[in-house]
Amino acid sequence: MSSFDGSFETTGADWSTVIGKISADTMDDGGSTGWIIYEDYTTVWNVARSIFLFDTSSIGASNTISDATISIYATYKGVVDGDNVSVVSSNPVSNTGSVLGDYSSLGNTSYSNVALNSISISAYNAFVLDSNGKANISLIGVSKFGFKTGKDVTATAPAVTAAEYLQASMAEQTGTSQDPKLVVTYTLPVNPKQDVIWFD
């Protein structure tokens, strides 16, 4: 099965409306860069989320995951409120492309949090997955993750002066040197640990 990435943006009159929407107003699953997270208030709230799928079927059902890290190559950020960037689950309709309704497929359990203030630009930034995040990795299929702001995860309304942005390279950028990646360390039934890297 193939995998993909995409970003989704929506606008609402208030915070609860915009994060509770079923479908995004716009989406992009073909750009070389995309909004990983985005929250901003003008006269209405604007929120973006992103989805990343990785084909991890080569791990195999008999193996055990010990460590896992998702890394994204950041290209731009803006920080006002100092929110976190959170890895969550996702469950898009397709494993090969986006629909607007995928906006609401992201979960509300954080698998990894990194402060937006600490994100480095023009560099990979690592999100080490906790036990729930590792459990979300498919041993025989496609592993489905996404990104939200910390306040989007907890449904906590930011101050109207808040503005948080993070943009990163997507799989469609030229080459693989900046691709989103999932690095998994797993144990074979009888052999030593093995590291494998997947690019989406």
Write out the residue ranges for each language-model feature.
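Flexible, small-residue-rich N-terminal segments that precede or flank a structured functional core
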Residues: 1-56, 92-96, 104-108, 112, ...
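Beta-strand-rich interaction/scaffold domains
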Residues: 8, 12-13, 75-143
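Extended extracellular/luminal ectodomain segments enriched in beta-structured repeat modules
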Residues: 46-49, 59-70
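A short beta-strand element within beta-rich, extracytoplasmic domains
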Residues: 54, 64-76, 182
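Active-site-proximal beta-strand/loop segments in catalytic clefts of secreted hydrolases
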Residues: 56, 72-75, 90, 148-151
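Surface-exposed acidic, glycine-flexible loop patches that form ligand/cofactor-binding
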Residues: 57-64, 133-139
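Extracellular beta-strand ligand-recognition surfaces/modules
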Residues: 137-160
